[in-house]
From Swiss-Prot:
Disruption phenotype: Long hypocotyl phenotype. Expressed in rosette and cauline leaves, stems, flowers and siliques, and at lower levels in roots. This is IQ domain-containing protein IQM2. Residues 481-490 have a biased composition (Low complexity). May be involved in biotic and abiotic stress responses. Residues 462-480 have a biased composition (Acidic residues). Its main location: cytoplasm. InterPro entries: IQM (IPR044159). Residues 425-440, 491-505 have a biased composition (Basic and acidic residues). It comes from Arabidopsis thaliana. GO terms for cellular component: cytoplasm; nucleus. It is found in: Cytoplasm; Nucleus. Residues 408-505 are annotated as: Disordered. Keywords: Cytoplasm, Nucleus.
Amino acid sequence: MGVSFSCPFAEQDDVEAALDSVTVKSISFGDDDECKTPKRSVNFNDGTLEPTILKSMGSGKMVVEKSVSLKGMQLERMISLNRSVKDNGFEIAKEFSVLDPRNPKHEAAIKLQKVYKSFRTRRKLADCAVLVEQSWWKLLDFAELKRSSISFFDIEKHETAISRWSRARTRAAKVGKGLSKNGKAQKLALQHWLEAIDPRHRYGHNLHFYYNKWLHCQSREPFFYWLDIGEGKEVNLVEKCPRLKLQQQCIKYLGPMERKAYEVVVEDGKFFYKHSGEILQTSDMEDSESKWIFVLSTSKVLYVGKKKKGTFQHSSFLAGGATVAAGRLVVENGVLKAVWPHSGHYQPTEENFMDFLSFLRENDVDITDVKMSPTDEDEFSIYKQRSTHMRNHSLEEDLEAEKTISFQDKVDPSGEEQTLMRNESISRKQSDLETPEKMESFSTFGDEIQSVGSKSTKVSEDYDSGDDEEEEEEMFELEQESMPSEQSSPRGEEKEEGETKESEVVKITEESILKRINSKKETKSFQLGKQLSCKWTTGAGPRIGCVRDYPSELQFQALEQVNLSPRSASVSRLCFSSSSQTQTPQMSPLWRGMSLPTDITLTNS
């Protein structure tokens, strides 16, 4: 016995229109006997009968089938419902709406992916800058060991192999960055170079502590990868710089459009903001402790702003780029009251300060009554006492060290190698206190910040004050930590010459090496400005320029080590630990076949 029931409804264009349906009911008790009810038609146009059907979400066709069969005292019942929606079936569309390019959620997801990919690329370029610089110094040391004709290092006396290897590691640890556009721009120290190439521009003073930690650990991961993703992700230097402080203090690097709000012009001897036309006023009754800073760019454009420690500093104006002069000032109603050279980043010299005074005279600024020293006398006197105490204390230590070394030389003449190392350490200490009469035409990164005239050293000692005192007191300690000795080789390097493998150094032609060396000698500076292929307007300049400035072989090696080169698959197994391999993303097809990403040169930091 079977019973079937069907309700095919007619297709309608309008839900509210008349709906006709035909109902056919048949009852079957076997194959022979069949009873079929007559066909009945029901019209819902008249209001006499309330429709009892389900309302569809749109125009369509609904079929309801019901069958009942009795076989062997078993009841089977099946109900099927088929519905096809044509116009407004949003149940199905809702599931795939996120894939619609017009959906805001889809756009947000794509944007998030692009931002992450862009940040990942910037981090890899920053690691490239560190790796390629270390490879360059290692290459030069190999060249020096094999041939003495490369006139790069001015060595007046014979050095042992161990001493030279230690010096090479020292230079690799003191990687720094600077820029020279007009020959007078000051350079950034190591910690500020790290700050400039860091995609987040974390405060270089804080970043330097973790850089030293990375140098002395056994990890083979690049620095920024190690710090943010790899083995050093959980490292927290609580006593020196907690991880929270490192992440919170990020320096704001202004772009070309952002820095226009800080541009200041001088009209009739008064200072005005060029963009807004407002008169410059640094004296604030509500915030008397505020400090206002300025920089003069190499194109003679003046920028003035309020300093915020760990957020906005001298390097913020030009995105870590070069300046002719930098310091602090006091302006009341557009009239200059005080100005003095002070910048922890740029270390302005007396010559830089004189250039700034010339700039003021050219713009008809009366500097007769302008005070050229810190306005807070108490702060100035305290700092002067501190600096005097530090100098005297250091001189006493140096004298004692010299006596000790002299005594040991008499007792043990065979200790030539150790004596050379100690003398080298003492000379580095003295470079912080004394200034050579003649600057070398080509100085190392670590020593260049100290190579200034004797007058400029006095100006720096007298005028520097404020928040950077702590940085200057800790700088020598940081540099000593960045200089591993023979007993402590950083990042798993060999301790002795015999254990060093020549195969680890990329083979580069002598022509390429001499070409870069000669270009540096011509510019009288080991800086990036004249070698950059793109205009340095954002924080992307240091990252890209640092890589482009080196021979192509070193570029390829550094790009491979951070998986930005087609050959990085095999190299990554050698340069990354097993834990970092699984976390390192695959290379994007965008970089495949490219020696260096050229389309990122205009990317903002």
